[in-house]
Design a protein with these regions (language model features):
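Electropositive phosphate-/nucleotide-binding environments in soluble metabolic enzymes
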Residues: 53, 119, 186
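Conserved GTPase G-domain signal focused on the G5
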Residues: 1, 36-37, 155-157, 183-191
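Active-site glycine-centered loops adjacent to acidic/histidine catalytic or metal-binding residues
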Residues: 78, 152, 182
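Short, contiguous acidic/charged loop-to-helix segments that flank catalytic cores in large enzymes
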Residues: 85-88, 113-117, 180-184
Length: 191
């Protein structure tokens, strides 16, 4: 198993090296398990990756190329969901995902804003993100990492809570910190 994980890590390293030579920005979707990363990935890319309410429904990083509104291509990566107190035996399995996240130009931190545990889950994800090395550009320079919170599952909120969340998100959106969406319905996702 360790040899297979090392082989996967080596292969992904070669892919990342090749991508660094291509001037496409990369966007990584990260978040707690079941936050809706795969549903958002499908919405953004027109893909049909498995999106289920299951622990580890996504077991590997999936990438697709999209066109940004300005017509510029970008690579979007759907990653494995995080969980609290990940068993030590599984940490190694997640290393490849974390390496992909470390290379991203933009990290979309997808949160299940309807979950009563959303704030605690966000702290868990943020703690992991702080441990990831700063990405390096094609010439060895440190790249600036930008993180945008995506408050997902607004469709599951009661009307009063939804109005409050949308107001908070709008204030943070103007600062480039958060957006509120429903990946399921497409609400809040601009073409």
């Amino acid at each position: 198993l360790k040899a297979e994980l090392e082989d996967v890590r080596r292969t992904r390293g070669l892919h990342r090296t090749a991508r660094r030579k291509v001037p496409f920005p990369t966007v990584a979707l990260v978040g707690y398990t079941n936050a809706g990363k795969s549903t958002l990935f499908n919405r953004l890319t027109g893909s049909d990756v498995v999106a289920k309410d299951l622990l580890f429904a996504t077991l590997d990083t999936t990438q697709r190329t999209i066109r940004l509104p300005q017509g510029r291509p970008a690579i979007v990566a759907d990653t494995v969901g995080f969980i609290s107190d990940l068993p030590h035996e599984l940490v190694e399995s997640f290393r490849a995902t974390l390496e992909e996240v470390g290379e991203a130009d933009l990290i979309l931190h997808v949160r299940d804003i309807a979950s009563p545990d959303s704030a605690a889950q966000a702290r868990d994800v943020e703690a992991v993100l702080k441990q990831i090395e700063t990405p390096v550009g094609p010439n060895g320079e440190a790249k600036t990492r930008r993180i945008l919170e995506v408050w997902n599952k607004t469709d599951l909120l009661d009307p009063e809570t939804r109005e409050s969340v949308l107001g908070q998100a709008e204030r943070l959106r103007t600062q480039g910190k958060a957006v509120a969406v429903s990946a399921w319905t497409g609400q809040g996702i601009e073409p």
